[in-house]
């Protein structure tokens, strides 16, 4: 028996970097509601009392940027001055230009030119059969802890909870499958009056125990709840936030490789985002079809060129048929050209703000078409299984 451990982390929607991601994707959604094929690359910076937007946007849409920013910040929970960051009073600055025409000429579709990739780059997709949603278990449970913290905070059940929080989960694996929780770290911002003992007890009983599988918790499990002692100063007061700084939280928690490109604030012509979503779709269908227990796909592109420059499959020795056959089936069943994958996943929709917290993958919402396993039956049949 082979025993290993693996750790992944998540952060809450009130974490400064996630505030930035949500604002960037809210801008994208607001534009796509009016102009689905707009070119959007929206970056956000947040710090005490300030939100700054930047990037390149080419669109016919008009969006009240200030109103949108304030709405997002307030909805997250930064809605009064005691938190040091308030959607009603923060400054909103903007420095947004248009997409370079040199980029546009390679990406736009016109006579004798198919839509090309918005940039060069490499993207990965991953799936594993260790959870029902075919995600790595450490990141899956780290996200669920953060969702639970937000649920309790917004419901007022633990009225001392504040928006900023982080989680980290270390799981023990035996022969490639998770069997136990070896460590949990949960840090949550709180109001100053709460007693440390009460906080520890509430986090354990109301957040950790309801989320993590009871059979995985054991006498040796380490619990680190607000290990610095106090966490009153948080959000953009404690740390600056920037779009695209939580790319491992957004994906597979480090269990799979990452091409380096962030997602939030980018329209589907940017393969950093759309091809990573397509990669998840491919990998999940391969695992759902039973062709492998684990699957990682890499795709790469050249700017302005439609066809991927490479497609490769890694199954970590868990394949049930030849990897060469899996690669052949991927090419036959999935159109990974920019235009093809956008159509395949119906990505010209204002669905992106929902992706910007608690993970882009592993949440089977109707809008998240890349989580469907509708290709699994055909893949399995064509593989002869």
UniProtKB/Swiss-Prot annotation:
Similarity comment: family membership: Belongs to the AdoMet synthase family.
Name by which UniProt lists this protein: S-adenosylmethionine synthase
Keywords from the named record: ATP-binding, Cytoplasm, Magnesium, Metal-binding, Nucleotide-binding, One-carbon metabolism, Potassium, Transferase
Compartment(s) where it occurs, according to its Swiss-Prot or TrEMBL record: Cytoplasm
Pathway: Amino-acid biosynthesis; S-adenosyl-L-methionine biosynthesis; S-adenosyl-L-methionine from L-methionine: step 1/1
GO terms under cellular component: cytoplasm
Organism of this sequence: Hydrogenovibrio crunogenus (strain DSM 25203 / XCL-2)
Note describing how the cofactor binds: Binds 2 divalent ions per subunit.
């Amino acid at each position: 028996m082979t025993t290993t451990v693996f750790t992944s982390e998540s952060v809450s929607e009130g974490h400064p970097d996630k505030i930035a991601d949500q604002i960037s994707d809210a801008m994208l959604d607001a534009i796509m509601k009016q102009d689905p094929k707009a070119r959007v690359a929206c970056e956000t910076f947040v710090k005490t009392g300030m939100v700054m937007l930047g990037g390149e946007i080419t669109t016919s849409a008009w969006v009240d940027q200030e109103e949108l920013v304030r709405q997002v910040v307030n909805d997250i929970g930064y809605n009064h001055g005691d938190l040091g960051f308030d959607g009603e009073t923060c400054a909103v600055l903007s420095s947004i230009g248009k997409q370079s025409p040199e980029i546009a000429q390679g990406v736009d579709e016109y006579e004798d030119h198919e839509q090309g990739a918005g940039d060069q780059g490499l993207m990965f997709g991953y799936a594993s059969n260790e959870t029902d949603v075919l995600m790595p278990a450490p990141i899956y449970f780290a996200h669920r802890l953060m969702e639970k913290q937000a649920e309790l905070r917004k419901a007022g059940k633990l009225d001392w909870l504040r928006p900023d929080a982080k989680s980290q989960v270390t799981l023990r694996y035996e022969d490639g499958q998770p069997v136990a929780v070896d460590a949990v770290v949960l840090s949550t911002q709180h109001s100053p009056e709460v007693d440390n003992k009460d906080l520890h007890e509430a986090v354990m009983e109301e957040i950790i125990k309801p989320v993590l599988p009871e059979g995985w918790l054991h006498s040796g499990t380490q619990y680190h709840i607000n290990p610095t002692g106090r966490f009153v100063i948080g959000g953009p007061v404690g740390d600056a936030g920037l779009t695209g700084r939580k790319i491992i939280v957004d994906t597979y928690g480090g269990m799979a490789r990452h091409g380096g490109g962030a997602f939030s604030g980018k329209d589907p012509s940017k393969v950093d985002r759309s091809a990573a979503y397509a990669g998840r779709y491919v990998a999940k269908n391969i695992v759902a079809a039973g062709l492998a227990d684990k699957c990682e796909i890499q795709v790469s592109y050249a700017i302005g060129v439609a066809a991927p420059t490479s497609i490769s499959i890694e199954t970590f020795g868990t394949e049930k048929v030849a990897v060469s056959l899996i690669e052949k089936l991927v090419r036959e069943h999935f159109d990974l050209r920019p235009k093809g994958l956008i159509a395949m996943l119906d990505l010209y929709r204002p669905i992106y703000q929902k992706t910007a917290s608690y993970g882009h993958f592993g949440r089977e919402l109707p809008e998240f078409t890349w989580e469907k396993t509708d290709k699994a039956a055909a893949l399995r049949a064509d593989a002869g299984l």
